[in-house]
From Swiss-Prot:
[4Fe-4S] cluster 2 binds at residues 21, 48, 51, 54. It comes from Microchaete diplosiphon. Signal peptide: none annotated. The lineage of its organism: Bacteria, Bacillati, Cyanobacteriota, Cyanophyceae, Nostocales. This is Photosystem I iron-sulfur center. PROSITE patterns: 4FE4S_FER_1, 4FE4S_FER_2. It holds the Pfam family Fer4_7. [4Fe-4S] cluster 1 binds at residues 11, 14, 17, 58. It is an enzyme of class 1 (oxidoreductase).
Length: 81
């Protein structure tokens, strides 16, 4: 099941989300928009299990990474209307 993984430009390039992901959905890619000169990327969203460990690991005040669960997961969790 695929979930949407969004990475925002508030990413500081710390790699915490990449290390927290149990399914290797994330990787770091070069980016000049932050001091670390890298940003998280999500090239394998089809492997995302929706655990949101990446969100939990993010140290920025506004989460730089968000996982939006697919409709099937939301329904199975009783969150759908």
């Amino acid at each position: 099941m695929s979930h949407t993984v969004k990475i925002y430009d508030t990413c500081i390039g710390c790699t915490q989300c990449v290390r927290a992901c149990p399914t290797d959905v994330l990787e770091m890619v070069p980016w000049d928009g932050c001091k670390a000169a890298q940003i998280a990327s999500s090239p394998r969203t089809e492997d995302c299990v929706g655990c949101k460990r990446c969100e939990t690991a993010c140290p920025t005040d506004f989460l730089s990474i968000r996982v939006y669960l697919g409709a099937e997961t939301t329904r199975s969790m009783g969150l759908a209307y």
